[in-house]
């Protein structure tokens, strides 16, 4: 038996089976044990191959591709610690729903737990984080091609959310051999190779989807009540639909930075601190939350404390998604589908004073930030930097909170992020995947520690199919800890950890454009030129370390003193 040839036959069938379930992008790291998978991917005309030398970044590249394409994306890595490096991206996908297929090459069973090189226990390595796991046997002609393709079809049909881990042991040799061998094994599938459908067309009915989505029987009753809408993470079209729907009902909509609703009541993180605004919201009889991953501290505090008669949470992702554990209903379905089944009825707005508090908060922001070139000012004016027909990727930590609190993004403008586990690892890689999936002009904004954490992902940005700007807000450390009651004496050394770096040489190292503007007009002009010029440019904005956190705290205090508005 020519082991190397049959390994490749096995891998070719595996990759072809995945394409029948919509896999179009595949991300590949270098490695020898994964050779059968890599060669099969390279030879498959249905696959677009992406490569990266760092498996942690590779996993996040796939995550970004899956986010923006809404398609399942496959990843190939070799055995050993290369597999473990996929963990952060897998965890994020499990929380935010992107479908990843992790193809992890492995040593055969006889090389495990005996001191063989680069051999670790890969089965079950990811514990409960994958949605599904398949441990394939070592390739052998004794196992039919029908078994392999049916196993893969069954797993892919069940994958509605999160990651599928397929562990793939391969014995040596991995190279050479007569390519004509074992053609009969592949040919046993007949004309399937010329088809475009799965071998096994398995239909899965998750519990929430046994029947088409039915309208809530008492919706016509509740839509006549005083309601509040909370908008978390959702798609661009869903955000537009929700904004119009809430406006017709006359219900206030509190939109997260990721909601793509246009945040009709901007600066919610500020005005929600006003006692009178809280009193108004307390009159709500029903709260409807669409999407999860809320950013605002004040919104989360209000969401936890509110006690409406009913609390409904609508999101296509499974699970509870409500850490406050409200009494009410958890409806698992796409936001747009729910809205179409639950029409709004035009009603007079019941909480008009909230708009006044929002306008006052926004005016306070404009006054406070006037003439500043600061982290807070960039967050407030970020919408002015967005490219036409483009997209935005927002990092984690302090910057996303400042944009949420001080900015207002256009309704329906695509916004992406990693707000499942909210880590700062892999943000540049994820942004690269988002850009590759859509080929749209892309603005990505992250902090300096996030950029350092994923610095070698700048290699992924060298070849972009549309203009890309990476905006690094350098506040010299993790200044989000300045918002928290961390011990002052230990804050800098053990929490913020300032690194005293600039990113000019990093940009040069990876052949990227670079700019370091010193004013808002300079920043705006640099970004505008980037959209015209193309390629990728790293723009570094150096700001005083704690100014962003201090400005946010100052504005919260100022807004609480806004005079009470008559209802």
UniProtKB/Swiss-Prot annotation:
Under the heading InterPro entries, the entry gives: MenaQ_synth_MenD (IPR004433), MenD_middle (IPR032264), THDP-binding (IPR029061), Thiamin_PyroP_enz_TPP-bd_dom (IPR012001), TPP_enzyme_TPP-bd (IPR011766)
Q: Under which EC number(s) is this enzyme classified?
A: 2.2.1.9
Residues making up the signal peptide according to the UniProt record? none
Keywords in alphabetical order, please.
Magnesium, Manganese, Menaquinone biosynthesis, Metal-binding, Thiamine pyrophosphate, Transferase
Record's catalysed reaction(s): isochorismate + 2-oxoglutarate + H(+) = 5-enolpyruvoyl-6-hydroxy-2-succinyl-cyclohex-3-ene-1-carboxylate + CO2
Annotated cofactor note: Binds 1 thiamine pyrophosphate per subunit.
Class of the enzyme per the UniProt entry, highest EC level: transferase
The cross-references to SUPFAM superfamilies, in alphabetical order and at most eight, read: Thiamin diphosphate-binding fold (THDP-binding)
Q: Transmembrane stretches, by residue range?
A: none
Q: Which Pfam families match?
A: TPP_enzyme_C, TPP_enzyme_M_2, TPP_enzyme_N
The GO terms this record gives for MF are: 2-succinyl-5-enolpyruvyl-6-hydroxy-3-cyclohexene-1-carboxylic-acid synthase activity; magnesium ion binding; manganese ion binding; thiamine pyrophosphate binding
User: Family per UniProt?
Assistant: Belongs to the TPP enzyme family. MenD subfamily.
What does the UniProt function comment say about this protein? Catalyzes the thiamine diphosphate-dependent decarboxylation of 2-oxoglutarate and the subsequent addition of the resulting succinic semialdehyde-thiamine pyrophosphate anion to isochorismate to yield 2-succinyl-5-enolpyruvyl-6-hydroxy-3-cyclohexene-1-carboxylate (SEPHCHC).
**Which PANTHER family does this entry report, sorted A to Z?**
2-SUCCINYL-5-ENOLPYRUVYL-6-HYDROXY-3-CYCLOHEXENE-1-CARBOXYLATE SYNTHASE, PROTEIN PHYLLO, CHLOROPLASTIC
The name on file for this protein is 2-succinyl-5-enolpyruvyl-6-hydroxy-3-cyclohexene-1-carboxylate synthase
Q: Which gene encodes it?
A: menD
